[in-house]
Amino acid sequence: EQDLDFELGSVLVSNTFGAQLRNNTIDGVGLRSTREREFLADIRFDSVDQSSVSTYWQSEAQWTQSLRSTTSLRYDRFDFDVTSLAAADPTTLAANSGRKNDSVVSGSLGLIYTVDDSLELYANIGQGFHSNDARGVISRLDPVSGEAIDAADPLVKTLGSEIGARLFLTERLNASLVLWQLDIDSELLFVGDAGNTEDTGVGSERHGLELTGYYQIGNSWSVDLEYANANSRFETPIDGFDDIPGALEHVVSGGIGFQRGDGFHGYLRLRHFGDYNLDGGVDAEGSTLLNARLGYAFNDRLSITVDALNMLDSNDRDIQYFYESQLRGEPAPVEDRHFHVFEPRAIRAYLEYTF
């Protein structure tokens, strides 16, 4: 990464140029049939090698004492290499192995205006992307049925925008509000029993708001509260419904924490997910989770921490899907909710020493 600053008339322009390299190699990733945690058979099992190279430029200009702007440009290239090692239908191994690459150029623009010491306004618009599961990018056959499936696009473009305000009400209290929108060129759906992703071929639109508030109580204690709302819809309805499976609509989180000068620190945090769509007219139940931490730093090098996870021992559902499956004794597959509850209440202790 390299910085380069210069003046454009009376305007100071700060530039950053850089490059990134990344490689992920997974010798084995898959979905397997089990009974009471005992392995029965592979549904699919693959080795994945994924690498990326990126170059970027970011520029910030201070136009006036109150107004500044940010501009950025980025290039990304991804290479996917998948070898299918095992599958419920072994004849699909060759078709679900291979290589593919893709690249994308993205740009963004942002404006920030400082009204006074207590209020800052901003607006951003930018292009982006998300990379899809390498297995879904390469696969051409369903590993269970052997039927032909559409491979997913390696990189899917997005366009996002937001306007917001940051409020510094007092030295101890600050808050923020942002309204946002995100358009995605294509949405994927997870097919649980097949262990693959399915390209809907349909784009999506999301918009919502986020509220945050932070308050410092004295010198040791602090309280924070965050709320996020998102309205997510397919651009074109699928099977008569435009709800996106798995897209959360309401998220609330908050906590209270402390950091004392004598080395003690800790927090209590609550997170709540509201009900959300699973498939068409079927909804998933919301969930609430409470965690806590207490720690003590003996010095700059040695500390001990104790975490209490799922303090209320909640049986709320941590993850949920709606798809077709067949249990022993059932004459035919049945569509139903499939879920995993939170891990039971657990206490974990950590001893950390920094060299």
Language-model regions, residue ranges each:
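C-terminal beta-signal and adjacent terminal beta-strands/loops
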Residues: 223, 296-355
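Face-selective signature of the C-terminal outer-membrane beta-barrel domain
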Residues: 1-87, 112-114, 176, 224
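Residues on the lipid-exposed face of transmembrane beta-strands in outer-membrane beta-barrel proteins
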Residues: 2-4, 55-61, 101, 109-113, ...
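Gram-negative outer-membrane beta-barrel transporters
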Residues: 2-3, 176-184, 200-280, 354
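Residues that define the transmembrane beta-barrel architecture of outer-membrane proteins
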Residues: 49-53, 101-105, 157-161, 205-207, ...
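Membrane-embedded beta-barrel scaffold of Gram-negative outer-membrane proteins
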Residues: 23, 27, 114-128, 152-234, ...
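Repeated loop/turn-to-beta-strand initiation elements of outer-membrane beta-barrel proteins
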Residues: 10-12, 66-69, 118-121, 171-175, ...
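Transmembrane beta-strands of outer-membrane beta-barrel pores
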Residues: 21-27, 75-81, 125-131, 140, ...
